[in-house]
Design a protein with these regions (language model features):
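A eukaryote-biased signal for short, well-structured alpha-helical docking elements
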Residues: 22-77, 112-115
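Contiguous beta-strand segments within globular domains
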Residues: 72-111, 147-152
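Beta-strand-rich binding/interaction modules
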Residues: 116-124
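Short beta-strand and strand-turn-strand segments in soluble, beta-rich domains
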Residues: 127-135
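Short proline/glycine- and polar residue-rich coil/turn motifs
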Residues: 138-146
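Short, hydrophobic beta-strand segments
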Residues: 149-164
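Internal, hydrophobic beta-strand segments that form the core of beta-sheet-rich folds
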Residues: 162-176
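Short beta-strand elements
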Residues: 176-186
């Protein structure tokens, strides 16, 4: 019994140490967005992109189109309902909820070799029209599958509107090595 307790304690302390070593990077806002040269590489690629708009009004529930036998009116929108509740979890007051409304971007990408990679999100917002903004996160010695999250929320979203066009770049040594963009990006 003592052995099991000791093993459990060792596992918890090891996982705590490993979690402390890899803090989640936070995006920094760029004041000036400089154009970069393009040198696309097969060593870097975007795997998947998840976009979510969390607005003040929840999406309307619709009846499932798969089966007429279902009596649950929200069955087709279950994942959207979960995403909304996930993003609003812990927001008690109306002010807390207002700071969570906005655009959420999750980019899943892969690096086949170790490299210092910067993930940059360039975007335009509804009320700012052609004004280009950017946020970026840098990963040292990145290799394998990675996930980068960006959130245009709170006052940025409430004052400037929703994101209407975006592109995400993987940058190595000042060169664009992979790109993912929205349909409206020029």
């Amino acid at each position: 019994m003592k052995f099991v307790a000791l093993l459990l304690l060792a596992t918890i302390s090891t996982s705590t140490v490993l979690a402390a070593r890899t803090p989640k990077p936070t995006p920094r806002v760029l004041t000036k967005v400089d154009p970069l040269p393009v040198a696309l590489s097969d060593d870097f690629q975007f795997r998947k992109t998840k976009l979510f708009l969390l607005s003040q009004t929840p999406p309307k529930l619709r009846r499932s189109t798969f089966s007429g036998a279902s009596t649950n009116p929200g069955i087709a929108e279950m994942s959207l309902g979960f995403e909304r509740s996930y993003r609003l979890h812990g927001a008690i007051t109306a002010a807390d909820r207002n700071q969570r409304y906005g655009n959420y971007f999750d980019f899943f990408w892969r690096a086949k070799r170790p490299a210092t990679v910067t993930v940059r999100l360039e975007y335009r917002q509804e009320k700012l029209r052609a004004f280009l903004q950017a946020r970026e996160v840098t990963y040292e010695n990145a290799k394998g599958n990675n996930k980068t999250e960006f959130a245009i929320i709170g006052d940025d979203y409430l004052q400037d509107g929703r994101v209407i066009a975006w592109r995400c770049l993987l940058i190595e040594n000042g060169r664009i090595v992979a790109e993912n963009r929205s349909f409206l990006w020029e």
